[in-house]
Swiss-Prot record:
The keyword Transmembrane appears for this protein: yes
Protein name according to UniProt: Protein SanA homolog
Cytoplasmic side: 1-31
InterPro entries per UniProt: Cell_Envelope_Assoc, DUF218
Organism ancestry: Bacteria, Pseudomonadati, Pseudomonadota, Gammaproteobacteria, Pasteurellales
GO CC annotation, single: plasma membrane
Function comment: Participates in the barrier function of the cell envelope.
TM region positions: 32-52
Record localization: Cell inner membrane
Segments on the Periplasmic face: 53-244
Major localization class: membrane
């Protein structure tokens, strides 16, 4: 229903925009007007395509997203997707804090047996898996239940490496809903059995929503082109849940 309403609203806005701009260019030559109208239609079609991809992804993975921990099926492992601990302004990142709280709750509620912390590790000063590991230890999660993937540079890397490198064949992704949806798209495209437990998130700013639309477009192109993680290598299987 929400998907249909979004498309109808976009079409109404598009028609109004085209009518308004067409009125503005009537003073120009017919040749210029035709060129402008063609360009306008192309831009409008591109916007509609982006919205279709964005809403289509949300609809496609809707059955694999869980917000209630009581309804979440058990999986041996949770893949916790990394993000920066602090914002650009130096304030605590609520997305980061919420993901750690969600990961901790999965351990406490015995919805998973261990955590795979995956994130960026490009420099000595910026290390998402290390930060998550340290903070989860402070939150009381035993270090024996946590493993780190230092090559989770992108969502695509984190999801595929969990399967190919760490040999985790079924797992729960932990992140905010908009991020979960993109991660699940990647997982399903690679025949990876994954579900998602949604971490709490603040109200999304418009800029965040726009960035996510473009991130989803890029994810679709990556899947079409068969883009692989930056780093693969020898498998490093995580212990079976029965050994923990």
């Amino acid at each position: 229903m929400r998907f249909t309403k979004s498309i109808k609203f976009s079409l109404k806005c598009g028609r109004f925009f085209i009518m308004f701009t067409t009125m503005l260019v009537k003073k120009f030559s017919p040749k210029f007007t035709a060129l402008f109208r063609t360009l306008l239609y192309a831009i409008f079609a591109l916007i509609i395509l982006c919205l279709l991809v964005d809403r289509g992804i949300s609809f496609y993975v809707r059955d694999k997203i869980f917000t209630n921990i009581d309804e979440l099926p058990f999986r041996p492992c949770a893949l916790v997707l990394g993000t920066s601990k602090y914002t650009v302004s130096g304030k605590p990142n609520v997305y980061y804090d919420s993901r750690l709280m969600a990961a901790k709750s999965l351990i406490e509620q015995q919805k998973v047996n261990y955590l795979l912390l995956s994130g960026d590790n490009r420099t000595l000063q910026y290390n998402e898996p290390r930060a998550m590991f340290r903070d989860l230890r402070k939150m009381g999660v035993p270090k024996t239940l946590m493993f780190r993937d230092f090559a989770g540079f992108r969502t695509l890397d984190s999801v595929i490496r969990a399967d190919k490198i760490f040999q985790v064949k079924t797992f729960t992704i932990v992140s905010q809903k908009f991020h979960c949806e993109r991660a699940l798209l990647i997982a399903q495209a690679h025949n990876i059995d994954a579900i998602c437990f949604v971490a709490k998130q603040p109200e999304l700013h418009f800029s965040t929503q726009i960035r996510e639309v473009f991130a989803r477009i890029k994810a679709v192109f990556d899947l079409i082109l068969g883009v692989e993680p930056y780093f693969l290598g020898e498998p490093q299987p995580l212990p079976n849940s029965t050994t923990l």
